[in-house]
From Swiss-Prot:
Gene3D superfamilies tied to this protein: GHMP Kinase, N-terminal domain
Recorded superkingdom: Bacteria
Entry's Gene Ontology molecular function annotations: 3'-5'-RNA exonuclease activity; tRNA binding; tRNA nucleotidyltransferase activity
EC number assigned by the record: 2.7.7.56
Name of the encoding gene: rph
Name this protein carries in UniProt: Ribonuclease PH
Annotated organism of origin: Rhodopseudomonas palustris (strain BisB5)
Length: 237
């Protein structure tokens, strides 16, 4: 039995609320159960120096957690003077995931910066961030399209992410913190709307996992991503 009493293939309650920030070109408040992330997408008429003159744009991401997003206060990284390795890893993952489904040529010579700020953390902050980031990005691109700043299709597909793990010997979908901290194996899957894989991160926390167990986790992830993509489409409709 899972601590949350969910079925092995059951997501937490998921919500994606678009257009929640007045000033941002795109935004989304994403909730995976008690994990809440505010995502904004900002259009910037500038590019990294190494991209200038190439006729294409860029999508990048930043990620951070509010001090009381966690049970005990976490010191702000700005106060510490540097980002920790986990933060850098996650924001690079978010950026890679979004660029995989964006036509950077169609975007033109401009940059969209996606900021993911964790308001409350209960496991799966990176997967929630990626899923909400797609909605915020779509919101931003819609804003641009209404102003004739872009033409054609910039977003080539959806992208969503979900965690899976082996908890008490059973493959389960969408781990919360209680499960993640006790799981024998945990993995994150980033997938497109048509089921292609962008990235897989998997770790055996206690004992190695078999190929069959990995395939069971991937099947769960595909089911979860399909549901998340449906929710994304509803959010931007």
């Amino acid at each position: 039995m899972r601590p949350s009493r969910r079925a092995p293939d059951e997501l937490r309650a998921v919500s994606l609320e678009r257009g929640v920030v007045k000033y941002a070109e795109g935004s989304c408040l994403v909730k995976f159960g008690d994990t809440h992330v505010l995502v904004t997408a900002t259009l910037e008429e500038r590019l990294p120096p190494w991209l200038k003159g190439q006729g294409r744009g860029w999508v990048t991401a930043e990620y951070g957690m509010l001090p009381r997003a966690t049970l005990e206060r976490t010191r702000r990284e700005a106060a510490a003077g540097k980002q920790n390795g986990r933060t850098v890893e996650i924001q690079r993952l978010i950026g890679r995931s979004l660029r995989a489904i964006v036509d950077l040529q169609a975007l033109g010579e401009r940059q969209i910066t996606v900021d993911c700020d964790v308001l409350q953390a209960d496991g799966g902050t990176r997967t929630a961030s990626i899923t909400g980031a797609w909605v915020a990005l779509a919101d931003c691109l819609g804003w641009m399209k209404t102003r004739n700043m872009i033409k054609g299709t910039v977003l080539r597909d959806n992208v969503a992410a979900i965690s899976c793990g082996i908890y008490n010997g059973t493959p389960v979908l969408d781990l919360d913190y209680a499960e993640d901290s006790e799981a024998e194996t945990d993995a994150n899957f980033v997938m497109t709307g048509d089921g292609r894989i962008i990235e897989v991160q998997g770790t055996a926390e206690k004992t190695p996992f078999s190929q069959d167990e990995f395939l069971a986790l991937m099947a769960l992830a595909q089911k979860g991503v399909t549901r998340l993509v449906d929710l994304q489409k509803m959010a931007v409709a």
